[in-house]
């Protein structure tokens, strides 16, 4: 069975799927256009199906107004709710910095420090998911 979750602006826009229980599935993907609209990535959005993927509803905008496109959202295996998804950003049109982000199940987004002077550093609060 094929079901369309959403569309995107680039064939390399990729995200991940979570199966919360037998019926509820979550997809987190860069499905909104980002600041570099012709390149891979964009703004990160959360989509949920409560009927095993038969239909999908946009439930939250995780990033918006970003400087660089976000992409390659990944689902950590056996992770806790404080580390629910992670991804990076970058400008696909030119050589640029790339930062790492992670998302908590309750909708908080954190950015990892770009420069680390010690082995351990605190993540930087980045934004909060806007629920739809």
Role assignments for model-derived ranges:
Residues 1-132:
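Extracellular, repeat-based ectodomains that mediate carbohydrate processing or recognition
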């Amino acid at each position: 069975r094929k079901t369309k979750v959403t569309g995107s602006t680039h064939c390399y826009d990729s995200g991940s799927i979570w199966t919360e229980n037998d019926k509820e599935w979550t997809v987190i993907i860069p499905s909104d256009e980002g600041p570099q609209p012709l390149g891979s990535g964009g703004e990160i959005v959360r989509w949920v199906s409560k009927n095993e993927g038969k239909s999908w509803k946009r439930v939250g905008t995780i990033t918006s107004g970003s400087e660089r496109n976000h992409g390659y959202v990944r689902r950590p295996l056996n992770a806790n709710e404080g580390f629910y998804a992670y991804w990076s950003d970058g400008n696909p049109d030119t050589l640029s910095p790339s930062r790492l982000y992670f998302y908590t199940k309750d909708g908080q987004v954190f950015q990892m420090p770009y420069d680390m002077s010690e082995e351990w550093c605190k993540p930087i609060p980045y934004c909060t998911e806007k629920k739809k």
